[in-house]
Amino acid sequence: MKPCFQINSKKLEKELLFRDEEDYIYGVNTLALILLQFPGVVVYAFTLMSNHIHLLLGGPREQCEAYYDAVMHRLSLWLKRKYGLSGVVPYGPENREVVVVKGVDHFVIEVLYLLRNPFKAKICYPGDYPWSSVGMYFSRRGQWVGRKASTFTARELRRMLKTNVRIPGHWEIAENGRSFLTL
């Protein structure tokens, strides 16, 4: 088993990372797009909450932390572009919590911790929360089916994913532009 780390952003007190569906879709897509820059990192689980994120990552610690910082940096650019907010998304060592996962039992506990966040916050049951990886493990497959990226034109992908990054053709993309991480 690769070294694993649960990395959380600190909760924003006055602003939100995600205000609407478009923001959440952008966040999920960011997790996938930034992963292309870090081939040594694996995303095992994630939960995007309105004011913070949780990631369970595998790989060398430095790469996992760099991946997290790149995700947060891209989200900060999004908030600046969409809402005119600067400096809202703090990233870097002092603005994240890193838990070293020690063994398989601890790994399972961390996955459950991440996926229970929406329930703990009294939003909904974990299986009903669309902005986490829970559906990758425990869903009715039909709700997660998208089209292969290779079936979209480059222009359609740019519009939906808000990036010029070349997307692997096997990635699944929903009609609303949400990509699906292959976990």
Give short role names for the model-derived ranges.
Residues M1-A45, M49-S50, G58-L183:
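Short Pro-Cys-Gly-centered "Cys-loop" motif that presents a nucleophilic cysteine in a tight turn
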